């Protein structure tokens, strides 16, 4: 049978190393999966092994520490020099090899936040690299020490089973990137910015040192930006030239975004915003294999990128988190069954910023993969299960329960599935969330779940149906503030698809994620919008990365303004009144008002379904208004408990 993804699944050879297909996994900061151990624990090993099991050709892990050891501002570093750390790192490589993938390790180098601390100063490529911190220029003696340290690391990595390593020089923020950028490299010696050869000299010397220590067959992945921001002196044309300058030193070139905040593309950008840069480098005649990264998960898009010759290889980080079986589904020709990443960045932020439990919005197993053998035991008997509510929590619960063999009926009082996610159909910047909603609906259509649309479930109906268990996922309703004139406001969910019914001038009450997204949707439809937020900052409920990106996109619109520290006191025909931080009464004139003050759990509706005839589980917003990740995780947990 002809493969649907023949090019993506074709083997690829670099030197004497053969990759089974073109799909790599990108390194991520996963240390929130464990405690402060300086070695990978069972949670980390299981996580990476699952990617190999799911079909990845290369699993690139994060990461070993740089020389010299610095204060632990870097959450990514294992200690490669401790014997017991080496044992666990060897187990990690072995687990990856067990499923047929190559094991690669990202070797961490200094960043602006975690550099080389020597004699009380932050040692960097050039003086003044880090604003607000005392810095010293790296001496040639220290550069030699760094090369020696890299050799020591790769010798150990090769000995304990790793096939390759990765060096990071993207975004001009790391050690190697600092040499590349004119903004950070102010040296006056042969490593200075006078030519591209000079700026790459130290990198190439390090690559040569690695190959000298570990051999040519120990491959080097090199991550770089296809271009850097204005002022850095590095364009896509420079990147094409650079590819030729490193091709005899490194083995694979990752082509990434210009900045750290662009590296994690979200729904504000096209799905694969970096492919054009990889294509440019390929077309330049560079001989080094080119890997593209950024936003990949659609198997058809990936197949086209390889088949058209725009790139040789593709790497994904979040794609493998959302669906660790992505590669398996490629081999089975089931691209439509790949779980879409919604690009919310809760994975990155939970691990790298918040330092709490590692999570994924669409993969409820994330963070507990190593526990699933004891958590997800086969049911002792198959039961008749009702799920009430067709939002993300209800659909996840129904699918999970059905996959366990139970007989499942899903009741949804409206004529369509999707619940609170249906708004995403109308907002271009939420297209990833819309894909996830459509994915759940499609999976239900293929499943044995009986879906009853337009049916409001009642306690009497459930008792009469002889259900053994009921999962209640009836969601939440928009919270309406108890203020004069509140009846004049439109709830935020109503706005989507009905934007033309609102006046040109709109005030949105509430500056959380829902309110700010609604405001952005309205300005993109031609409205003039002011967001009124009681707290001193907007978007306090959003993940840090999404908050930064949404704030940035809001800032592009002159007709979108925000007022913070203002407590709404009423709505009149003239507009919205509020009390400012000084206690003065103010008026925001407008023709329409949108209420985005939060959601109220439909707890009474949930409680009305309780009966001793069956066991009840409440999940999602009807238990506590939260986000999609928490709703889906709770739904999954309830379903595997039956």
Place the predicted regions along the sequence by residue.
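Residue-level detector of alpha-helix initiation sites
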Residues: 296, 391-393, 416, 476, ...
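A conserved FAD-binding loop/helix module that cradles the flavin
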Residues: 542, 548, 619-642
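Glycine-/small-residue-rich beta->alpha transition segments that form the dinucleotide
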Residues: 467-469, 473-479, 590-602
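Glycine-rich dinucleotide-binding loop and its adjacent helix/turn
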Residues: 364-378, 442-443, 453, 460, ...
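Internal hydrophobic alpha-helix adjacent to the cofactor/substrate pocket in enzyme cavities
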Residues: 323, 327-329, 520, 524-525, ...
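Flavin-dependent oxidoreductase catalytic cores
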Residues: 1-388, 392, 396-403, 407-408, ...
């Amino acid at each position: 049978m002809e493969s649907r993804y023949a090019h993506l699944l074709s083997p690829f050879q670099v030197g004497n190393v053969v990759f089974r297909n073109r799909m790599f996994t990108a390194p991520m900061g996963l240390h929130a999966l464990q405690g402060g151990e300086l070695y990978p624990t069972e949670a980390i090993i299981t996580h990476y092994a699952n990617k190999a099991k799911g079909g990845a050709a290369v699993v690139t892990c994060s990461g070993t520490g740089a020389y010299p050891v610095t204060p632990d501002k870097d959450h990514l570093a294992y200690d490669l020099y401790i014997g017991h750390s080496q044992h666990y790192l060897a187990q990690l490589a072995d687990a990856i090899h067990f499923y047929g993938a190559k094991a690669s390790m990202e070797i961490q180098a200094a960043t602006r936040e975690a550099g080389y601390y020597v004699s009380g100063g932050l040692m960097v490529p050039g003086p003044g690299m880090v604003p607000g911190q005392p810095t010293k220029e790296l001496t040639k003696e220290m550069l030699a020490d760094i090369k020696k340290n890299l050799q020591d690391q790769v010798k150990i990595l090769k000995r304990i089973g790793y096939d390759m390593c990765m060096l990071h020089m993207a975004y001009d923020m790391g050690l190697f990137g600092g040499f590349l950028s004119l903004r950070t490299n102010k040296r006056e010696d042969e490593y200075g910015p006078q030519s591209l050869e000079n700026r790459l000299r130290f990198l190439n010397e390090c690559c040569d040192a690695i190959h000298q220590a570990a051999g040519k067959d120990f491959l080097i992945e090199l991550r770089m930006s296809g271009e850097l921001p204005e002022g850095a002196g590095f364009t896509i044309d420079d990147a094409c030239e650079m590819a030729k300058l490193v091709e005899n030193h490194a083995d694979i070139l990752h082509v990434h975004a210009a900045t750290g905040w662009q590296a994690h593309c979200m729904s504000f950008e096209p799905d694969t915003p970096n492919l054009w840069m990889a294509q440019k480098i390929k077309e330049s005649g560079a001989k080094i294999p080119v890997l593209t990264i950024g936003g990949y998960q659609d198997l058809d898009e990936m197949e086209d990128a390889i088949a058209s010759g725009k790139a040789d290889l593709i790497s994904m980080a979040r794609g493998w988190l959302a669906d660790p079986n992505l590669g398996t589904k490629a081999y089975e020709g089931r691209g439509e069954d790949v779980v879409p990443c919604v690009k919310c960045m809760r994975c990155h932020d939970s691990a790298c910023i918040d330092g709490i439990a590692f999570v994924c919005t669409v993969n409820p197993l994330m963070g507990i993969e190593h526990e699933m053998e004891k958590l997800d035991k086969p049911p002792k008997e198959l039961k008749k299960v009702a799920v009430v509510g067709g939002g993300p929590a209800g659909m996840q619960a129904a699918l999970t329960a059905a996959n366990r063999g139970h007989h499942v009926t899903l009741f949804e009082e409206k004529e369509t599935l999707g619940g609170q996610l249906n708004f995403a159909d109308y907002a271009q910047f939420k297209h990833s969330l819309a894909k996830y909603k459509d994915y759940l609906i499609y999976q239900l259509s293929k499943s044995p779940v009986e879906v009853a649309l337009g049916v409001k479930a009642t306690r009497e109906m459930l008792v009469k149906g002889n259900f053994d268990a009921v999962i209640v996922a009836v969601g939440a309703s928009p919270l309406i503030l108890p203020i004069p004139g509140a009846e004049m406001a439109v709830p935020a969910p109503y706005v989507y698809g009905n934007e033309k019914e609102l006046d040109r001038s709109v005030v949105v009450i509430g500056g959380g994620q829902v309110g700010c997204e609604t405001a952005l949707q309205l300005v993109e439809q031609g409205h003039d919008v002011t967001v009124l937020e009681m707290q001193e900052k907007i978007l306090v409920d959003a993940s840090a990365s999404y908050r930064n990106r949404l704030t940035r996109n809001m800032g592009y619109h002159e007709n979108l303004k925000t007022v913070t520290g203002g407590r709404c006191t009423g709505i009149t025909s003239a507009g919205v009144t509020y009390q400012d931080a000084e206690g003065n009464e103010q008026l925001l004139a407008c023709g329409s008002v949108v209420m985005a003050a939060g959601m109220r759990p439909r707890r009474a509706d949930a409680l009305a379904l309780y009966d001793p005839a069956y066991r009840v589980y409440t999940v999602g917003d009807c238990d506590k208004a939260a986000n999609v990740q928490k709703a889906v995780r709770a739904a999954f947990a309830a379903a595997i408990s039956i």
